[in-house]
């Protein structure tokens, strides 16, 4: 990407000029409206040859979260789900550990580590005693990358509209978190005392306004959100058209007809089906990993 020309820190463009370079190749122009084009212009004005647009598609793939935030004011939203071959995510009792094997769980740890935010719901936290932390010993990375992941953990965000998760739950004991709710702001003090932040964002139906929440996270500099949630919350993201990417881990087992479905997504007709473009499918240990992108309607 082009060298920035902003002066919050010493700009890279000035460093390149001072280095006496003859030519600079940039994959793409910085989409940040505060700096867009200024770094390249600084180089050209200094007599440095500039070529922009080399391997731009690869650069966009590497920076999809930042690019989406700059271009739309929303983060890149990735929904991770694990299911059986018959499309079930948990037994009727809520038991879900473990559907997939250790290799798939290691891949999920790496997804968490690369994300700005890991977001979940009260149902998941209560049912699984989930912490949603990055577990360094399960990343399967070298020592340097493991240390980097441990030093820069994602922000954990809990959607808990009625504040059902107690403050002594493992999720809260694992570290600070952002709790998004519809409940009265009077409870904020209790959470702040424990090192957590509370944000009240209710929509007209009395639910947490997910679209506004994504905008709020973007204003905080969040590029990528990983949603790890049950069928109700994951289905809400899908219904609102907020999902950019599904990552589905499929285990070679059947959980049966009474087990819980993948998504709470009530549809009556085939024409309502959410179409996906499968861009990758590969084996992960004894499981399969499918990466699929929602097919957007023209103009969306």
Where are these regions (language model features)?
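Zn2+-dependent cytidine deaminase-like catalytic core
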Residues: 1-59, 183-185, 238
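Enzymes that bind and transform nitrogen-containing heteroaromatic metabolites
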Residues: 5, 25, 36-41, 76-300
